[in-house]
Amino acid sequence: MTHTIKILPEYFNPTAAGKKAFEIRRNDRNYQVGDTLQMKEWNGENYTGREIQCYVTYFINESKFGIAEGFCVLGTRTIDIIIPKKKRK
């Protein structure tokens, strides 16, 4: 299953750079290992056009390791990064 979700710039950048390979999310979508995340960068007002697509490789829910109720940690592996070219004026 593919889940389209928002991602803020402060999390998009380290994910795109390969420094962040996890997501902490509200577990309201029945995430499963093998799912695809389509993460669209959201700057608080608009989508920027930048996207990251990744596989869910690992899943931990709130019953483990002190994770808050209703949340989960998703291990991720990047498939693709989409950064639109800037338009020339």
Where are each of the predicted segments found?
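Catalytic phosphate/metal-binding cores of nucleic-acid and nucleotide-processing enzymes, i.e., regions
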Residues: 1-89
